[in-house]
Structure formats: C-alpha cells, structure tokens
Regions:
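Auxiliary Fe-S-binding modules of radical SAM enzymes
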Residues: 1-92, 244-253, 258-345
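Short linear Ser/Thr-Pro motifs
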Residues: 75, 108-109, 122, 192, ...
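Generic beta-strand structural signal
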Residues: 80, 92, 103-107, 115, ...
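P-loop NTP-binding catalytic core
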Residues: 88-102
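Canonical Radical SAM [4Fe-4S] cluster-binding loop centered on the CxxxCxxC motif
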Residues: 98-135
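Conserved alpha-helical substructure of the radical SAM core
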Residues: 124-153
Length: 345
C-alpha cells in the first residue's frame, strides 16, 4: 500500500476521476465533495449516504485534512487568531476578522515563507513547505466550525507567498468557489503577492475575478530592495508593467499594499513618487500601519502621518484608504503567534 492521498486536495473533477477509478458511479464524487467541502466532515464514517465498501476503500487509501487548534486568541474587536497544527506537526496561522458585511478569513498558503521581507515575522524562520489545497481550505472550515459563523470572504495574506505555491493555490481557489462546496465567489477573494512577475502573468491568463493585491511598500527600487529582497529579482521596471498587463488582461483593478514604516517610506516625497509610479492605472492603494515585530529594525508610522500620507496621495489623484487595524491586542503581526509558540512563549 502506497502513501495515502489527502482527498481534501482534490478538485471536483479530480475527485470524480478518482472515484470512477474505484469502479463507482460519477454521482458519488459529488456526494463526497459535498461532505468534505459543504458539510465539513473530517471522518469518512460521517458520510452516511455512501456504501460501506466504498467508505472502507477511502479509509484505507485516503486522509482528510483536519488541522487541530493548538492556540486560539480572541481580540476585543472580535478578531480570532488561530495557531493550527497540521498532520505532520507543522503549525500555521489563520485569522478570522468580523466586518459589517460578513466574516473574512485570512489564510496561510505555506509553512513559513522564503521571500525574506524584513518587516514580516512569518519569514524569519524561512519556508518549510507548501500547504496543499485541502490544508488551505481546512483553515476556513476550522474557523467556520469553531465560531459557528459563515465565512463570506477570503484573503490569501497569511504566512507564505501564494504565487510561490501556485498550483496548490489554484486548486484551492477551484475547490473553495465550487457550487458544490462552500461556494465563496471569486469577487469575495483577495490574493496577495510580493511581486513574482512570471506568476502574475500566469495568473492573468486564468481570468479569475478575484482581487490581486500587490505588496508594493515602496515607490523606488533602493527603498523596496531594502525592505523586500524579491525586488532584486523583479524590480519595479518589471513589476509595474506586469500589473498593467494583469489589469488589461482581466479587467480587474489591482490593489497595492503599502506598509507605512517610520522614516523609510512615509515622506511627502515618497507619496509623490508613488503617485507617479502608478499613474493612469486607476489602482487602489491600501495603507497599512505595520505591527511591531521582534527583531525587525522597522517601527510603525504614527496615525497622523498615515492620514497625512493618504491625503497627499488623494490630492495627487490616487485612491487610497487606511486599513482598519484589527486584533491589535493579540499577536496580530503575521507569523508572530507561530514564532512565539516555537519559542515556548
């Protein structure tokens, strides 16, 4: 008997091929998919409309992604942060945020991260491995079952670079938006990237109706390379044209993420440079007051400075908003809870 497959990783088409390969009718695949991704079961024995012989086969050949909540923190504003332990013992973070329009879950896509952004806690120990499609989906299901509340929006902005785990993330998006599952529409999904240009072009060809959020954080190469080593491989001269191509190909407006760092990227000169860089794109800029990270040389810009920067951008014709800060009284920085757990705090 070979290694078991994680049945949660299979898209409906892949699951159908697998079930038919077991000599079962196609409709069984749709039933099983619903058990996994709509009813959110984590045991084959819970699939009460399936033949016992098939369940025995599945039990023998397959597993179901079912992370365990290792730590749970709840903020005064209702934000819930989870440290989830995977089947192999690795841990990831997932955050549920409550808004007036519904609940958003921020998912991780890798265990650790290889991108090395210097203001981010999740990259400090490097990348361990990619998450599978089913493991990413299970983050949402775990939060939904824990709170008893429906999740309506997803942001792929947790630990890891989604486009560095491209194929698994594409399968996850297909699973999560499938009408036979939790059926979260693409327009309710945001995917964040630090700027892997070839993968942005590959994503554009898929014409998905999600929102692409590009972690920009600086409007010139010198500053950006100091904050984000990925800029050495894909400088702004490559990244911004890729963003323009993406908008043209998909018809979807890009959002630029801009973490405000005191004395680094928060001056009026930087606002002018940023406006010039993205001129004519009609893009949205999301200004983010950074969370403090142990061991990082960076500190957050004060609120007055953030709002001054926002007003300067708007005066220059750039649509800019300040991200609402949630979970500030818990280990809110991405990767911080996982790091604290590893250090035994």
């Amino acid at each position: 008997m070979g290694e078991k497959i994680c049945i949660s990783d299979l898209t409906l088409d892949a699951l159908t091929a697998y079930i038919v390969g077991l000599g079962q009718p196609k409709f069984r695949a749709k039933q099983i998919f619903k058990w996994l991704h709509q009813k959110l079961v984590t045991e084959f024995s819970q699939m009460t409309d399936q033949p016992k012989a098939l369940l025995a086969q599945l039990e023998e050949q397959c597993t179901i992604a079912a992370p365990v909540i290792r730590r749970r923190q709840q903020s005064r504003d209702g934000t819930v942060k989870y440290l989830l332990q995977l089947a192999d013992g690795n841990c990831i973070e997932t955050v549920l945020m409550r808004y007036k329009y519904g609940n958003t879950v921020c998912v991780s896509t890798q265990v650790g991260c290889a991108m090395g952004c210097r203001f981010c806690a999740s990259t400090q120990a490097g990348r361990v491995r990619d998450l599978t499609a089913g493991e990413i989906a299970a983050e949402i299901y775990t939060a939904q079952k824990d709170t008893g509340e429906r999740v309506s929006h997803i942001v792929l902005m947790g630990i890891g670079e989604p486009l560095h785990n491209f194929n698994n993330v594409m399968d996850f998006l297909e699973i999560i938006s499938c009408s036979e599952g939790v059926n979260i529409g693409m327009r309710n999904i945001s995917l964040s990237t630090c700027g892997l240009v070839p993968k942005i072009d590959e994503l554009a060809k898929r014409h998905l109706q999600l929102t692409l959020s590009v972690s920009l954080h600086a409007p010139d190469n010198k500053t950006r390379s100091g904050m984000m080593p990925v800029n050495d491989a894909f400088p702004l001269e490559q990244l911004i044209p890729a963003c323009r191509r993406y908008q043209k190909e998909t018809g979807r407006r890009i959002s630029f993420e801009y973490s405000m760092v005191r004395g680094v990227n928060d001056s009026s000169e930087m606002a002018q440079k940023l406006a010039n860089l993205i001129k004519g794109m009609g893009a949205h800029v999301n200004l983010i007051p950074i969370n403090p990270v142990d061991g990082s040389p960076y500190s957050a810009t004060d609120d007055a400075n953030v709002h001054r920067f926002q007003k300067e951008l708007e005066a220059l014709g750039v649509n800019a908003t300040v991200r609402r800060r949630l979970g500030t009284d818990i280990s809110a920085a991405c990767g911080q809870l996982r790091r604290e757990d590893a250090q035994g705090k």
